[in-house]
């Protein structure tokens, strides 16, 4: 499967730096250390609730308003929240955004799957991933720049899903949770996604067996072999799926670090996001050429 993995990687737009185990493991370890620091400084944090009772429509409106400080103004569009038919709940994702027609991006739809347990903070961050400042926001923002129509034929899932994952991680800090609680949950989400992505590369590039995968997760204190077997079989059947989320996310984090160094005291989150959004979906090596001098 190695050749197929490389094809999936290149097609997603990751460039040549995809198999940077050290980079991904370093990100996981950094998130682990941040989690330890939060727990050390806030020993009672696990007793805090992550209850959020707003409706999906209210959450989306709240997110659209809250992102204005760090993200450029969104395109004026309509958003409809719909629910997956009961007969399809077993087969579809917890939530998903439908890409609008190329000639009418003002009408947008997000589907929520009530067959999945999307409660509290998970619903909030999922709507951020699919809506604001995630897929819906990125798609309509770029469409509003009047790009060459050929861009609609190109698919760079590393950029698209990397952006949505980055947006999801940012959304924890836009939620009603305390900052330490938001940080702990965000780091945990990042760690789990990172472990899956590293396993994805290990299985399909290095040929990890189930035993190798069990050992990988055990290194980080995850030792339920039945759960790991399910993860292993899922990854085995869908090569490179987790990479478009995690590697795309880490590429954006690394790009942001370099952009901050370049801008120095003039760094602006809103300007960084604006430049990244205006380049639009592309291989990260191309994105860098436009953003890093």
Predicted feature locations:
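N-terminal maturation segment of proteins
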Residues: 1-293
